[in-house]
């Protein structure tokens, strides 16, 4: 009894003759093959639900990202096609060198705008 008190420290009340008592029931101690309490079951279920939601969100985000990439690629293709057609229409009207100069100038202007 005195050994327990020395390990733990002296009582605040100063009653050194009081012995340290253990729990009568073993419910608070870890027991092998112990059934989970309802609170622990709920906690585990919440964790599983949270993991499921995270996985679902990750899949949704991945799917949306792929969709956005497809849309972006399609938009770029359309813009390139449109620009090519426009240059062809201009080339039909003007001399080839002049069209090439215009194309370079527009690229330069576009680069300046994007800065």
Swiss-Prot record:
Its predominant location is nucleus
Compositional bias annotation for Basic residues: 96-108
What GO biological process term is on the record, naming one? Answer: rRNA processing
Region described as Disordered: spans on this chain: 96-115
Q: Can you supply one Gene Ontology CC term for this chain's record? A: nucleolus
- Parts forming coiled coils: 40-101
Alphabetical keyword list: Coiled coil, Nucleus, Ribosome biogenesis, rRNA processing
Cross-referenced InterPro entries: Cgr1-like (IPR005579)
Determine the domain of life of the protein's source: Eukaryota
Q: Where in the cell is it found?
A: Nucleus, Nucleolus
Q: Which Pfam families match?
A: Cgr1 (PF03879)
Please report which protein family the annotation says this sequence is part of. Answer: Belongs to the CGR1 family.
Instruction: Give the protein's function.
Output: Involved in nucleolar integrity and required for processing of the pre-rRNA for the 60S ribosome subunit.
> What name does the UniProt record give this protein?
rRNA-processing protein CGR1
Record gene name = CGR1
